Amino acid sequence: MARTDDQAKSVDTRYNARVESLRDKEYPMLNGSIYLDHAGTTPYPKSLMDRFAKEMTSNLFGNPHSASASSQLSTARIEDIRLRVLRFFNADPAEFDLVFVANATAGIKLVADALRTAPDGFDYSYHQASHTSLIGVREEARNSLCLDDQEVDDWLGGGCPFENDSEDRPVLFAYPAQSNMDGRRYPLNWAEKVCRGGTRKTYTLLDAAALVCSSPLDLSQANAAPDFTVLSFYKIFGFPDLGALIVRRDAEEAFDTRRYFGGGTVDMVVCLKEQWHAPKAQFLHERLEDGTLPVHSIIALDAALDVHKQLFGSMRDVASHTAFLSAMLYTRLELLRHGNGQSVCVLYSPGPETANNGLSSGPVVSFNIRNSQGAWISLAEVEKLATLKGFHIRTGGVCNPGGIASALGLEPWEMRRNFSSGFRCGTDLDIMAGKPTGVIRASLGAMSTISDVDSFVEFIAEFYRDASLSPARTEPVPQPHDPSRLRIHSMSIYPIKSCCGFQVPSGTDWEVRPEGLAWDREWCLVHQGTGQALSQKRHSKMALIRPALDFERGQLRVSYAGELPAHQPREISIPLSKNPSLFRSSSSRSRSSRVCGEEIQAQTYSSTAINSFFSDVLGVPCLLARFPAGGHGKSMRHSKAHLQKHQLSLLPTARPALPGSFPPSPPDSDTEKTVSRRILLSNESPILAITLPSVTELNREIHLSKPGLKEVSPAVFRANIVMTPADPDVPLAPYAEDSWSGIKVGPQQHEFEMLGACRRCHMVCINQETAERARSRL
């Protein structure tokens, strides 16, 4: 008997209550967080870790390649667990073998490595929704094709995607059971239809990693199953970090030409006067599991299977629960409207109604956000704010280039142009030529709850829904041309990137260079291992590193305001001189540094005392590096600031007047040559300026929304120049600077062009005096 909607909802809410009841005990790490990145990995329960720890301290497990009692115990447990995992996926051990691998990608690579050693190689076709790891197989193939849904259907109808279908070369067809980008699911019977429909030997590779996160995988019909299935267990259980390649025994021949062999996979090796070896032949996994298996991870898998069932029941229960939550999330995001009626979210995932059409989708909702005027909201800005509010989501290309290109309408030439313009995976350049380059992905898992969905929808509505009825943006009232209307309240430089600022003494002349204020962000701290420039975003104690310029002694004096051991020096001095002897030799092998995703060639100090000072106070192995003005090539950077969407009204020549205004330059376009403005180690522009009236207004808004919170100090914005009205009786409108095209400063009327609003990251929530984070304020 079919359940009614009310009955289904009742079951779903009861199951949700069950999950809610175990969250605090089993997932204490989720307290204060809303975790919505289960498609990446799911959190692990406390009872699993407790059980694993007990297992490890109660038994002695040896290397399974030995004959000792501890080794035989490991071997027996591994084989029992191998069988248990096959049964978990309804795979008959007489029809399938399971090979333990590091993750799904390792399983994919194992298949590709085997097929490329075939006498004539192999041809490869893959679905456009494939994960990057599936796409990479094309580099090993003789020929490769990317297929969309229609092209797969044509193939199933009898048309081989490769021109010459009489060749003996085998074909490998790969596709995801579920897209990791939007949750769309693809027919598992494609594997059977492809194999039966063609004249060439065709193998099928199913990427089940995204599907098995929250749904059962049924391999009970061996003849209809894929030849190779890959998955990662940490996506199901959170722990252990382990994957599997499940091979249909009828397809084992694909590995016959594999050349490499590792320890434990051979019965005999001759290497002195002859080169010969005898691979193990009883089971395929014995030939493919090179070296010592991750014994402890496999044993942890046994505990993971037990605990998961105890907590959540069957995978069908998990699938039903996550489908219920996913439909709720999708529907509520779809219904969000701005005050003018425009949709807040553009959704790319299939809607819950597709289940009625014979399709299905996983618990993944991918979308982008538009403001009330239709402009795209930056993914980087969404992720930064989400991080501040305790949400864990995924943004960007999510390792699915074909799915992203299809959803966003990105042609290959556009993606190449974006790359040439500086777009890279992980950078903040997420809107290029008016189009987003990625998506926001929220994915749900077994321990997700209705309250998680409620909180996330409320977050989107609070920060991105414009409830005002009028879609028009109120233009600022033109101000009279009065260069004395403002004065500089304070001026600061930040000699070491992401560390405390140095306030320029009042009345002091200060040089303005093409790269910005002299000495500003000329030094940085880089991680010894990666070369990545350190930032307060990850290392908030950098706010307690206080640089001061001492021109009389020619030194940069650096002190630390935090707690230190008694023997640790509290201050160190660094010469301002660029004497080459201070730095590591350019000829020595050293990793280049990275700042905001850019590769730079900075000069790292050779002094152990200097580098140890910073490493000790931060607890991070780091080096002090210098990036002086006037460099070339990788010793030079350029501004990336640009007008934000809310400032596009500034593009016409008729801009509002501003203090000491000067005619604006014409807007940049794709065809116009842009002016390349040099910067040192600042994120986007040579100089950052704010006004005190805007900070005052921000504090007023914070007080209205959350009374009792401490005021925000202007220091958190880390501005070089803080401006305030010259005459207190002539106030400046808050946020008036958003409408300026530039300012003129000083008796000589030095011109400063406004490049764009600063996309300040969540460093604004770090108290610059105490290094404490206060995410609730902003």
From Swiss-Prot:
Region entry Disordered, spans: 576-596, 654-673
Gene of this entry: hxB
Protein name per UniProt: Molybdenum cofactor sulfurase
PTM annotation (N6-(pyridoxal phosphate)lysine): residues: K235
Function: Sulfurates the molybdenum cofactor. Sulfation of molybdenum is essential for xanthine dehydrogenase (XDH) and aldehyde oxidase (ADO) enzymes in which molybdenum cofactor is liganded by 1 oxygen and 1 sulfur atom in active form.
Cofactor(s) annotated in UniProt: pyridoxal 5'-phosphate
Segment forming the signal sequence: none
Recorded GO MF terms: lyase activity; molybdenum cofactor sulfurtransferase activity; molybdenum ion binding; pyridoxal phosphate binding
Enzyme class, spelled out: transferase
Bias (Low complexity): 584-594
GO process terms (BP): Mo-molybdopterin cofactor biosynthetic process
Catalytic site positions: C399
Domain MOSC: 651-778
Similarity remark: Belongs to the class-V pyridoxal-phosphate-dependent aminotransferase family. MOCOS subfamily.
Organism: Chaetomium globosum (strain ATCC 6205 / CBS 148.51 / DSM 1962 / NBRC 6347 / NRRL 1970) (Soil fungus)
Pathway(s) the chain acts in: Cofactor biosynthesis; molybdopterin biosynthesis
